């Protein structure tokens, strides 16, 4: 009997024992910084001369690790191993697969602060953001294990006295998992374990800037008893290894989280039926957003300002759910804007390894350059009232930036920035605010701050996003509580952490027996 699911609690760092435990986690990670990590194919650890070099984005001189890089030849070897392993893994008991997830979750829980410390070093996450990432990884494993137990016997369908009918789920085959750098543990672990607990085998290609946490997760899966060949670790270039695996005729599905442009490229390539391919590939994609917090004139204005600042600048705005636009009723615009500026100027941007740091660096030089280019655009399209500066001398640090008085059709209101920049736009009324919020090709998250019940219900129906929140920020979905995924160019609305997510990794089979 499995206990009911509830999410992993976040760590309270005001408790001295928790603070000391996290500091021990940092010391442990610092003791093995700079290590080399191999590919893992069929349980075999393979070291290559070509490496992916992972550095600390808060200190470019600090080497986090060097991870062997797969070639096309090694990717092909991994595919053959995964394809062969699938023939036995697909017949494994769902209960056994779920138990592996539960054991893996328990291992991570014991090493929680160590994994969070890796995220501090490799992803530049402050303590609270790193802790939440690790908690979410645990949540995915606990939740998907339980979901598989619910689905293992299929779903009841009608039978008649003369026949017995069953509706069952069977796994798809080999899945290619292409995970992101912004939640390099939680999303990577969630995508991987959803695929394997459903009976599929996996080729895991983690993000090139954060491969070490994925390599450490492979150790967890092995310790949890996952058979060799079920998950194969193949970091590599997207243009070489990624494209090759997406195109491969034995690939049955691709699960991707990342940018719009790469997601579209994967969707296009996966749609092509290549020689030897006997199925249509399935694509599960989450591709980003241009997320809006709408503030009504009948609202808690302090809550509004705090929600905007927290959602815009948590993890330096590098969440696909981050608030990139604040659309505010003209009657309360100045009040909310001024308060948000005050709160933003209180934020500390520093080394995320130091407790109390609000914001660390952005991911890498490319991210720094892109965000700073949008800061320059902001100077032309509005008024910068906070931030606007960046410093990439030691790490990739950008000050939290508020751009006021931005027109609703400006670039800052349309294009995904993926950094600590939020545009403020004035709305004439609530209908106008919703129209501005919906005026984007994305549809991932949004929030409405209002005390007007009619406006809440109107937004529930007309605000076209996959995750909509009322009287809170637009980030922080919790597995099993707020299934996550968006509309339009935000992806396939796959709803990670939801009750129908595992079904995307399986296919339904009907059997009918005449009695």
From Swiss-Prot:
Family: Belongs to the aldehyde dehydrogenase family. RocA subfamily.
Gene coding for it: rocA
GO molecular function per UniProt: 1-pyrroline-5-carboxylate dehydrogenase activity
Protein's name according to its UniProt entry: 1-pyrroline-5-carboxylate dehydrogenase
Coiled-coil ranges (or none): none
Reaction equation(s) it catalyzes: L-glutamate 5-semialdehyde + NAD(+) + H2O = L-glutamate + NADH + 2 H(+)
Active site location: 286, 320
Top-rank taxon, per record: Bacteria
NCBIfam families: D1pyr5carbox2, PRK03137.1
